[in-house]
């Protein structure tokens, strides 16, 4: 029978529930269990696709085209699985589904209420995740903090699941904070006690408490928490700040967290073999070289907006025993006069995806600098579109060349709406989303990176390269190294007379893994290291 683990949070948000859930997933997978994982977000948006990155951070896209929470990126990177649209559920999705059923008359004329209709829908999403993946274990993270009004239906639903399928098949893990008061020189357990009290008042008794802390938690403090929270002392797990995220699974294993989980759920599996993971962490902690990459974006104040990009750069660096330092460059501040000052000390330049016109001209200036000064360059989504526009303006001499997204009246729409997008009115969920094939041209940097004729990558865009400009740009050394199999859509571009200048319409960062870097990032970082060594 499928087992269910629920991860909740208390005291404050951003405690690392997602990392805790992902780390536990890795440990259970390495015990030979088939693990799937999902995130429940209590906001009323249907998905984060139309939310500002400042509100929510990065939008992570799954193979099947779901726009999801950035925690799914952690899940995929840690557990090394590909998730799907059932892996991220919001209040908006739940209510939308219930209202559609009500309109179809599925409730037989009854009054539709939070209990049982909303809670039943939430439970069905939990069970469906297990059914769709044939999982041995389903880990579900509940977003937000215990005490939030928005979370109440989700907490009630997961409370009911224990009654529905039995206590041996359900486990509750609560993540909290033990703050350190510098003035008093003390760590305080009271916030955790109150958070657990709140959770218990809702009918949920946590089986494990994971305490986030800056300082070591003494045995006396663990005993105190165990007493007041009514759990075993061994089930108080310390989650101290780590030097690398990838060390967290090893820390949890040292404290026998996965064994406690297996004992409670009556799973008789051998201990997790973390040899390969330990080697990865040792490598990460002992990188001997450095390279610096400029990330030129418009959301640089909130680095979570580019979290998968940064992780993909790091993964690529691990292959070369190199620590990749990201220099954050605000695209709005970049001008032709100061671009050398802002990016001249870096070994490579990356322009990530985005929407809208803010910061676009600064990104184009940075791309021009990379092209003219032979600096390794990687463009992603909007970065690929702007690389095309920069080339059209400054090599072909097409003054005013632009994207019709940025300037609908441009005389040269190098980037234009996909034909199927022309009549689309809704913004949410209507982009070209998910996994699509890309055919690679031989004897190109793109082909050399993948070493395969056809690859599959995840997309999230509405605009595409305008094919009427292809012949003129090709004559000037602009290479279309990746296209859709029918040749209609441009997927990857690069430059002939440049050490390494590649840009992709898709989002390669979404499939990178710490032990298996994404090929374009791998070769981009290698080119950046070569550039540094040649200076």
Curated annotation (Swiss-Prot):
Question: Keyword Chaperone, does the record have it?
Answer: no
| Top-level taxon of origin | Bacteria
* PROSITE patterns for the chain: GATASE_TYPE_1
List, from the UniProt record, the residues annotated as the active site of this protein: 381 (nucleophile), 507, 509
The residues that hold CTP are 13, 148-150, 188-193, 224
Check the record and name the HAMAP family matching this protein: PyrG
Tell me what this protein is called. Answer: CTP synthase
Tell me what organism the protein belongs to. Bacillus cereus (strain ATCC 14579 / DSM 31 / CCUG 7414 / JCM 2152 / NBRC 15305 / NCIMB 9373 / NCTC 2599 / NRRL B-3711)
């Amino acid at each position: 029978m499928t087992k269910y683990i629920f991860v909740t949070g208390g005291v404050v948000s951003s405690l690392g529930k997602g990392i805790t859930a992902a780390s536990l997933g890795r440990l259970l997978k390495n015990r030979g269990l088939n693990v799937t994982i999902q995130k429940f977000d209590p906001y009323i948006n249907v998905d984060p696709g139309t939310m500002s990155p400042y509100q929510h951070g990065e939008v992570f896209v799954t193979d099947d085209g779901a726009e999801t929470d950035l925690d799914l990126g952690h899940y995929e990177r840690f557990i090394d699985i590909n998730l799907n649209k059932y892996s991220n559920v919001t209040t908006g999705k739940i209510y939308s589904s219930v209202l559609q059923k009500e309109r179809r008359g599925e409730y037989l004329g009854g009054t539709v209420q939070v209990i049982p209709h909303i809670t039943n829908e939430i439970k069905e999403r939990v069970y469906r995740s297990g059914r769709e993946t044939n999982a041995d274990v389903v880990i579900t993270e509940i977003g937000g903090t215990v005490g939030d009004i928005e979370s109440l239906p989700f907490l009630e639903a997961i409370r009911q699941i224990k009654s529905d399928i039995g206590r041996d098949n359900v486990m509750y893990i609560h993540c909290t904070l033990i703050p350190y008061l510098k003035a008093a020189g003390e760590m305080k357990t009271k916030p955790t006690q109150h958070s657990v009290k709140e959770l218990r008042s809702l009918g949920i008794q946590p089986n494990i408490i994971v305490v986030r802390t800056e300082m070591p938690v003494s045995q006396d403090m663990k005993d105190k928490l165990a007493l007041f929270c009514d759990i075993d002392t061994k089930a108080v797990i310390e989650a101290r700040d780590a030097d690398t995220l990838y060390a967290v699974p090893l820390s949890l294993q040292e404290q026998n967290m996965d064994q406690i989980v297996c004992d409670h759920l009556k799973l008789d599996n051998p201990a997790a073999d973390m040899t390969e993971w330990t080697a990865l962490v040792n490598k990460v902690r002992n990188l001997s070289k450095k390279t610096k990459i400029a990330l030129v974006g418009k959301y640089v104040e909130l680095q979570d907006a580019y979290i998968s990009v940064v992780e993909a750069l790091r993964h690529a660096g691990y292959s070369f025993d190199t620590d990749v330092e990201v220099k954050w460059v605000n695209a709005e501040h970049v001008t032709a006069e100061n671009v050398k000052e802002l990016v001249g000390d870096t070994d490579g330049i990356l322009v990530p995806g985005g929407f809208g016109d803010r910061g676009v001209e600064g990104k184009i200036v940075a791309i021009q600098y990379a092209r003219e000064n032979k600096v390794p360059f990687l463009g992603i989504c909007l970065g690929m579109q702007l690389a095309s526009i920069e080339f059209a303006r400054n090599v072909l001499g097409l003054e005013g060349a632009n994207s019709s997204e940025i300037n609908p009246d441009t005389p040269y729409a190098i980037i234009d709406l996909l034909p199927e997008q022309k009549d689309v009115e809704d913004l949410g969920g209507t982009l070209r989303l998910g996994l699509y094939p890309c055919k690679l041209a031989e004897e190109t940097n793109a082909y050399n990176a993948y070493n395969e004729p056809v690859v599959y990558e995840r997309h999230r865009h509405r605009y595409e390269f305008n094919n009427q400009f292809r012949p003129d740009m090709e004559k000037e050394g602009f290479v279309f190294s990746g296209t859709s199999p029918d040749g209609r859509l441009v997927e990857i571009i690069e430059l002939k007379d440049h050490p390494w200048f590649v840009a992709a319409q898709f989002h390669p960062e979404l499939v990178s893994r710490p032990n298996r870097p994404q090929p374009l990032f791998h070769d981009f970082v290698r080119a950046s290291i070569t550039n540094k060594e040649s200076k």
